[in-house]
Amino acid sequence: MPSSFDLLGEMIGLLQTEQLTSSLACPLPNALTKRQDLWRALINQRPALPLSKDYLNLEDAYLDDWRASFVPVSVKDCQKTNYTSLFLYHGDIRYLAVDAIVNAANSELLGCFIPNHGCIDNAIHTFAGSRLRLACQAIMTEQGRKEAIGQAKLTSAYHLPASYIIHTVGPRITKGRHVSPIRADLLARCYRSSLDLAVKAGLTSLAFCSISTGEFGFPKKEAAQIAIKTVLKWQAEHPESKTLTVIFNTFTSEDKALYDTYLQKENNCE
């Protein structure tokens, strides 16, 4: 079985031979981390076009190795809160072994094309594998228009421990600007649409990232309040959906502190 180092080298060679990306003349690095960065840059930039069976076999082997490098996190490993159906998980959402994780997507729904970008969309698409971009392309081709803010789409999670990914596009907020009622409602719609889709698909566990708080600039405090209030209100309006466990995933210490505070009933997100 080839090592991850060798698999990366072969994938890079195939991607460079395609000449579909801008990073064509880079020599093959000798360091593992440099190879990882170059492969990720190439696959991040690659258009949503079919891939060869040879490449997909290599990618499957490499991502299987990645998947075996950590212990997946289940609902029972997550932090309990004062609400029996709400949990917290602080860490990398890609490690969650739940029915579905929520991806903060953009209106193209094809993932992030910026090489090695730090957004959640990039991380999820990269390590789910390139079949995810192709699946999203099929959705967008059938839809025939950009994805509207506040809607939700379901795909397989491919190489991630989760079974599915729910993709939703949140609202953008210019830094320093007040959160208008319209944008607050658009963010709430992201949560409602994701919950509705999860129930429609028969899912029993759903993990939300902090939608719109990264590249889209939504203030973290307001976003956390909207997220929790919206989910609690949705649960109250859908008593038949008590089997759906919701996990709020936090990645920064600021987000964790906010959710820790607001998920105490006495605070009530005010």
Curated annotation (Swiss-Prot):
Its EC number is 3.2.1.-. Residues 73-267 form the Macro domain. ADP-D-ribose binds at D92, I93, N106, C119, I120, D121, S212, T213, G214, E215, F216. InterPro entries: Macro_dom, Macro_dom-like. Binds 1 Zn(2+) ion per subunit. Gene3D superfamilies: Leucine Aminopeptidase, subunit E, domain 1. Its cofactor is Zn(2+). SUPFAM superfamilies: Macro domain-like. Keywords: Glycosidase, Hydrolase, Metal-binding, Zinc. One of its GO terms (molecular function) is poly(ADP-ribose) glycohydrolase activity. Zn(2+) binds at C112, H117, C119. It catalyses: 4-O-(ADP-D-ribosyl)-L-aspartyl-[protein] + H2O = L-aspartyl-[protein] + ADP-D-ribose + H(+). ADP-ribosylhydrolase that specifically reverses the SirTM-mediated mono-ADP-ribosylation at an asparatate residue of GcvH-L, by releasing ADP-ribose from the target protein. May play a role in the regulation of the response to host-induced oxidative stress. Belongs to the MacroD-type family. Zn-Macro subfamily. This is Protein-ADP-ribose hydrolase. It comes from Streptococcus pyogenes serotype M6 (strain ATCC BAA-946 / MGAS10394). The lineage of its organism: Bacteria, Bacillati, Bacillota, Bacilli, Lactobacillales.
